[in-house]
Structures are given as C-alpha cells and as structure tokens.
A protein has these predicted regions:
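Active-site donor-binding segments of glycosyltransferases and PAPS-dependent sulfotransferases
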Residues: 24-101, 253
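Conserved acidic donor-binding segment of nucleotide-sugar-dependent glycosyltransferases
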Residues: 312-320, 326-333
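Conserved donor-binding/catalytic core segment of Leloir-type glycosyltransferases
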Residues: 12, 194-213, 219-222
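Aromatic "clamp/platform" in nucleotide-sugar-dependent glycosyltransferases that forms part
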Residues: 277
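Membrane-proximal helix-turn-helix segments that form the acceptor-binding/catalytic region
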Residues: 130-150
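Short hydrophobic beta-strand element within catalytic cores of glycosyltransferases
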Residues: 290, 294-297
Length: 370
C-alpha cells in the first residue's frame, strides 16, 4: 500500500524591519513554531543584517536564510525596499511580512501590523516621531493594493486601522498572542501579594525608551511629594542616564533585562504599572494577566480591550489621576483584593503554535475571517 504524503504549503517570511524589543521577542516566539508546523514549510526567511534576528539559525535544512543588507540610512533603505526594490520579493510563494509596511511586490502578500502608530490619531509624543510615522502611513497607504490580508492583534487595533484606511475593510483579521515563550515556560503564577516588612508598593514597568511609552509622564512627580505616594519601588527597564525623574528615590532604572531577570521582577512586584499612550497589543499587559498580577494602566481603548474591568485605570494626561489609581491599588491590596483574569485570558491563544498556524493559514488562504 502506498502511503499518502500530505503536501506542505510553502511560505516566505519577511523580517527585515524587525528591530524593537517587543517585536523581536514576539518573532522569537513565533519562528520555532512556524518551523514545527507539519502542514507548512518555510521556503525562505528574509532577515535583518543587524540585531538579534540577524543571527537566526533555522532547524530546517530546506529553509533558505537571506540577509537583507542595508547600505544607506535605515529610513531611506526601507523606503527603497518597499517601493523601487520591492520586486526582489516577487514570487509565486506567498509572502508573510512581519514588519508593518507592505512591499511593492508581485506575490500573495499578508502583512502583520504591530505598531499602532500607523493608525490615525496615534501619537509618538514628539515632532520627529510624528514626521517619521506620517511617512510610514503614506508608504502603507501607497502599497495597500499589494496586500491580500492584514493581521492585527486586537479588535481595537482592527477598528483603528480600518478607520484610517477604509479601503482595507474585509481584509483585516485579528490574531491575538499569548505571553512570550520564555514566560510561558517559566510557569510563574501569582495569587497574592508578597509579604514584606516595607509597606510601599513595588511596581514594575518593562518598556524600552520610546516616546509613546510615556516615561516622561513621571517627570511631573514633585520631589517634596514623593513620600505621599504609597510606593517603595518603581522599576523601569531603561538606562539610569534616562531616568525621567532622578529626584524621586523610589524610581529605579535597571536598563534592559534578560528574560530571567524580568521573571524575577514579576516575582517581586505587587503590580504592573503601564504608562504607554499607544499600543497595538501591549505585551506586558498580557504577561501580567497570565501571571495573575494587578495592573494599573491608561484608560485607553487598547488597555480596555485586553483588561476589561479588572485593571485599575488612570487618565494619561493627569498625574493626580495616576496617584489616585496607585492609592486605590494600595487600599485594595490591604483589604485582601486580588484580580481575577480568567475571563480576559479566554480570548488569548493557549500557545504560540496556535498563533503560528493561524497566521500561516491566512497567508496561504486557509484561514477564516476574524
């Protein structure tokens, strides 16, 4: 009897524009799961020439790794890559672009949009960033016609993208993501506050230095009022020389942390403090929910979509609102309160294999609309 061999669907991955910390960690969780899917094969992976992903090694000998070298400043090189040089990615094998901006290429193209700054009204918090993303939005709109499918992480991001580019209605699909692989493997769970001798809150904000991450919001805390805040430590993952308010003794800047150090920080924290003004998803929110931690975050659509009524919200334009939220958390914890995230986590995939399969299903025309 002849055994039937199932044909594997070929796909190409475009990663040349993946640079941000959160985006890199997301791709590092996805790549091994893409490779493990038996129904698909990675024909080619286009890698950046610098950064962590440039050193990626595939476990599959059939996959061709192609390093995209840049000889011009990144912004100019990206513009050319997505327009005049887009034909480099022509081909009959579907292309899954994991870096936000479509390329002008003759192929079946699916684009995973991670940055919320492509949506109208999103703010970087500074003029230079606004110019950069105005150009990115122009380029995105210019190449929309080359894309079959867009993937986003939340319904809020889907709505924002369609509001900005109405012509893509019907082409946008939502695929949420779980916590990063390294955190899932840690099995860390928190069900109560740690018992300590000090009474202040230990807060953790894991975010790189980008304007929309809003570290500068902490500048408004007055040194002579610092002791009024019920906080013993706020841990920021930014360099000490970028400390937004060195006069506040309980703000500690520890620079970028390796995954094992992030896990340790979550073990010690009483809550996640999230300050970001704009997110397509907000991985730290998912991380904190998965662990079981309380969350203080801005009262913005991206946060409401994920956290529902379990988070403690504040007005991101009002420092006193943040202070009230922190006091509220302190009082709740003192009374024995702890959040219950089980309902919120029901919309989050259980693992990265589900996410990888859903993405490649859409990229090869086998996925269903969200």
């Amino acid at each position: 009897m002849t055994e039937h061999v199932r044909e594997r669907k070929a796909v190409r991955l475009h990663l040349t524009n993946i640079a941000g910390l959160g985006a890199v960690q997301l791709i590092q969780s996805l790549l091994p799961n893409f490779e493990r899917l038996l129904d698909y094969k990675l024909e080619a992976v286009y890698l950046p020439s610098r950064g962590e992903l440039s050193n990626y090694e595939t476990a599959c000998h059939e996959t061709k790794l192609i390093c995209y070298k840049r000889y011009l400043p990144n912004s100019i090189s990206r513009l050319l890559e997505c327009t005049l040089f887009g034909s480099k990615f022509d081909g009959t094998t579907p292309l899954l672009v994991l870096g936000d901006i479509p390329v002008r290429s003759k192929t079946k193209q699916t684009v995973f949009v991670q940055t919320p700054l492509l949506a109208q009204g999103a703010s970087t918090g500074r003029q230079l960033g606004a110019i950069k993303y105005w150009i990115a939005r122009w380029l995105f709109k210019l190449n929309i016609g080359y894309v079959s499918t867009f993937i986003v992480q939340t319904e809020a991001m889907k709505a924002a993208l369609i509001d900005t580019y109405p012509e893509i209605i019907g082409r946008v699909h939502v695929i949420a993501q779980p916590a990063p692989l390294w955190l899932l493997e840690s099995q860390l769970k928190r069900t109560q506050r740690n018992i300590r001798t000090d009474s202040g809150l230990r807060l953790f904000y894991p975010a790189a230095v980008y304007p929309h991450k809003n570290h500068r919001f902490l500048r408004a805390i007055q040194a002579d009022r610092a002791n009024v805040w019920p906080v013993s430590e706020l841990l920021l993952t930014i360099p000490e020389n970028l400390n937004p308010n060195p006069a506040i003794a309980w703000i500690h800047c520890v620079d970028r942390l390796a995954p094992d150090k992030v896990i340790k920080a979550y073990e010690n924290a009483d809550a996640l403090l999230f300050l970001s003004l704009s997110e397509s998803f907000g991985f730290p929110l998912v991380e904190a929910m998965w662990i079981g931690l309380p969350i203080i975050c801005p009262d913005l659509p991206y946060a409401r979509t994920l956290c529902g009524n379990q988070a403690i919200y504040f007005n991101p334009e009002d420092l006193n609102s943040l202070y009230v939220a922190v006091v509220n958390l302190s009082e709740r914890l003192d009374s024995g309160w702890w959040p219950e995230w089980s309902e919120n986590l029901k919309v989050i995939p259980r693992n990265w294999e589900e996410v990888a399969a859903a993405m490649l299903g859409l990229a090869t025309d086998e996925g269903e609309a969200a």
